[in-house]
Amino acid sequence: MSYTYTLRYVFDPRTNTPEKDEKLLNFVQKAKIDDVAFIINGEELNHSHLTKEETQVWLDAIIPLQKQLAKLGVTTSLNPWTTIMHSDRGFSVNPKIGFNTFVDINGNKAKDMACPADPTWRKYLAQRYAQYASIHPRRLWMEDDFRHYNHTPLKLMCFCDYHMKLYQEKLDKDESREEFVKNMLKPGEPTIERKIYLDQARKEMIENEHLIEEAVHKVSPDTDMGQMTSFPDWHAIEGRDWAKLFDAQAGPGHPRVARPHLPAYNEVAPLIYGRKFEEYSHTTAAFLGPHAELYPELENSMWTPQVKSNTFIAFQIITTALL
């Protein structure tokens, strides 16, 4: 077993300074960091889905740092913070981008969160990932918003008009959204509606991964594609096929690469951590198999020194050996 230490680094290209760059480079050397993954358009800096021009602003700010890191023997990776989008966050899709948003199980339509089968969104996302690949990152990550469930405050997706047409074609009859959802959730033996929903959810995400993988490796053949994962029970709701999904993402000649959720954004009792580690991290590792490259995500929230002790952080790192 070997370890690679990746620093997931948040910065704002609009307010970045040479002094901040110097702090980054000094920290990387002091902490013996192997790889820096630049988070693009992340957290409070997020301003909806980026256009080509907006994306280039981030890449232009990263490229000089990439060159300086390379002189230190440190690789550069990219972590765009959104695919579908975690939640609307007060934004709407830029008309220049113009894809359709998803509709949840209750008929609520998102303002900024993509329909995962929308052809315009699929083309848009593949183009953006090809653009990210243009700087030849070591790894190119997809976020855990690449899922059908947990897009606050909306519920399970997608039941837009386009999806309803797909479902009805497979049913060979017309059903309203309400009727389809009611039958899909009916207790007892799984209904044909449930099978149709899960088959479509599973299929469209694998197709999306394949489109992105092709776009990336056409530009940067040596880049590994990786994906952050959420709780396995969330992914079970959409019928995730872990093997096919991650093989589609990896592409020929590349490993399955994942960033499993590592429990505890705040310090908790070791017993609680252990249970969640088994439930989330260890289960994810089992789904991905013994040859996958795993980069468990160690993160603190909120971002202050008071959230965790150094001892607890060291404890978390040690537990990753169990994966």
Range-by-range predicted roles:
Residues 31-32, 39-40, 138, 149-150, ...:
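Hydrophobic targeting/anchoring helices
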Residues 125, 132, 140, 216, ...:
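Conserved, mostly hydrophobic/aromatic
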Residues 5-16, 43-59, 107-124, 189-207, ...:
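The substrate-binding groove and active-site-proximal loops of carbohydrate-active enzymes
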Residues 17-26, 52-65, 121-126, 201-213, ...:
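Well-ordered, non-membrane alpha-helical segments in soluble/globular domains
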Residues 3-14, 75-85, 140-145, 194-240, ...:
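Aromatic-lined carbohydrate-recognition surfaces of secreted/lumenal glycan-active proteins
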Residues 1-40, 74:
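N-terminal structural segment of carbohydrate-active enzymes
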Residues 75-135, 144, 148-150, 163, ...:
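Active-site-adjacent "subsite" loops/lids of carbohydrate-active enzymes
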